[in-house]
């Protein structure tokens, strides 16, 4: 989830008129909060208000709204018909965590928004560095207060929290109270992507996988070591990749190592900031574009992830694309199934367009979480 999207969303939400509109569905029962208890989850994060006709509804349970436009009436009715919750992303300014007046107003505004738009809850997406244990506790208290306020109105409202991929090492300086957050909410969505953070002293940076299964597994295990129940953990996975420029000229389209420019982030030298995020549909179109020279999709057995080299049309230089496909996603979904996690999720479900041949495998990989042994 990207901060610039969240900031835009919160500014828009705060100016939404408080007047409730009439139910747009032919069946007015669909405008009531979904009365569905705890279940296995497939949460899809949406950044586009118009792509919902392309969704696969077979196992989708929750859609996280990360755009500023109003929710389409058709989407609302379609989601509720399929038993899918709609929840708003919720960004909260860390500097206001000790301001009780601000907190009360914020919670009331969010509750009013959800009630007036016939939706089903909030997804907290606070990704700021927090290293002070007192501030971390204040964040937990905010989530708990929000959850209590929502549940006092309707027990079926859903409150979830997005967290970094590993709870043990203060990833991105997010030293949150993860156990407390898991108890204060319905579940945590572990963002198992953007994992490329290589050491402080690396002299040579190499392109690499966005979401290696070994790191996904170790991160999840570390959450459980804190005492967090597996039923409170949802594995969030990427439907996108990173396009990295390769420095130098001694490359072929079959070269494995791609040296990339250093890109400092929170003290790390080698991060995915050296690349450009590319959605899955565009990646597939690039592979099928005869004007783009590429070496074909390769498989890195160590990171269990696909990649390919190509010649950039604009610069004429070699690039390397690391991404996820149905094969790599299935490996991680199997980890979620084996660990008996609460569910899986995707950032974001608007990465696939109307080409069924491209999208069916990606949806199928996530839907495999629900298969019966």
From Swiss-Prot:
Name this protein carries in UniProt: Probable di-N-acetylchitobiase 1
Enzyme class: hydrolase
Organism (species): Dictyostelium discoideum (Social amoeba)
Gene Ontology BP term (one): oligosaccharide catabolic process
Gene Ontology CC terms: lysosome
Family: Belongs to the glycosyl hydrolase 18 family.
EC number: 3.2.1.-
CDD domains xrefs: GH18_chitobiase
Domain GH18: 21-369
Locations listed in the record: Lysosome
Coiled coil residues, start to end: none
Entry binding sites for chitin: 53-54, 82-85, 128, 191-194, 347
Stated role: Involved in the degradation of asparagine-linked glycoproteins. May hydrolyze of N-acetyl-beta-D-glucosamine (1-4)N-acetylglucosamine chitobiose core from the reducing end of the bond.
MF (Gene Ontology): chitin binding; hydrolase activity, acting on glycosyl bonds
Location of the active site: 127 (proton donor)
Signal peptide: 1-20
Glycosylation: residue positions: 48, 99, 222, 250, 269, 279, 288
InterPro entries: Chitinase_II/V-like_cat, Chitinase_insertion_sf, DIAC_cat, GH18_Domain-Containing, Glyco_hydro18_cat, Glycoside_hydrolase_SF
UniProtKB keywords: Glycoprotein, Glycosidase, Hydrolase, Lysosome, Signal
């Amino acid at each position: 989830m990207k901060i610039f999207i969240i900031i835009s969303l919160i500014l828009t939400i705060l100016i939404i008129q408080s007047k409730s509109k009439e139910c747009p569905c032919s069946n007015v029962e669909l405008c009531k909060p979904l009365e569905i208890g705890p279940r296995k989850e497939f949460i899809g994060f949406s950044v586009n208000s118009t792509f919902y006709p392309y969704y696969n509804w077979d196992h989708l349970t929750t859609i996280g709204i990360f755009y500023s436009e109003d929710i389409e009436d058709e989407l609302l009715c379609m989601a509720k018909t399929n038993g899918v919750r709609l929840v708003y992303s919720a960004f909260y300014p860390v500097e206001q965590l000790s301001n009780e007046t601000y907190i009360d107003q914020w919670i009331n505004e969010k509750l009013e928004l959800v009630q007036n738009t016939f939706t089903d809850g909030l997804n907290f997406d606070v990704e700021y560095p927090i290293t002070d244990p007192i501030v971390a506790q204040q964040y937990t208290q905010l989530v708990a207060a929000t959850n209590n306020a929502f549940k006092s109105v309707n027990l079926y409202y859903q409150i979830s929290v997005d967290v970094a991929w590993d709870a043990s090492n203060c990833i991105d300086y997010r030293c949150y109270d993860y156990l407390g957050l898991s108890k204060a909410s319905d579940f945590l969505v572990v963002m198992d992507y953007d994992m490329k953070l290589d050491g402080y002293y690396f002299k040579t940076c190499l392109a690499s996988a966005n979401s290696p299964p070994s790191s996904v597994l170790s991160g999840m295990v570390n959450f459980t070591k804190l005492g967090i129940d597996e039923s409170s953990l949802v594995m969030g996975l990427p439907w996108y990749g990173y396009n990295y420029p390769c420095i130098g000229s001694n490359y072929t389209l079959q070269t494995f190592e791609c040296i990339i420019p250093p890109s400092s982030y929170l003290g790390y030298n080698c991060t995915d900031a050296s690349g450009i995020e590319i959605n899955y549909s565009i990646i597939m179109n690039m592979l099928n574009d005869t004007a783009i020279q590429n070496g074909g999709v390769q498989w890195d057995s160590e990171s269990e992830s696909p990649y390919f080299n190509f010649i950039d049309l604009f610069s004429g230089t070699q690039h390397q694309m690391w991404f996820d496909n149905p094969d790599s996603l299935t490996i991680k979904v199997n980890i979620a199934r084996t660990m008996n996690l609460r569910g899986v999720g995707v950032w974001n479900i608007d990465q696939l367009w109307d080409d069924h041949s491209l999208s069916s495998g990606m949806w199928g990989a996530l839907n495999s979480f629900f298969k019966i042994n």
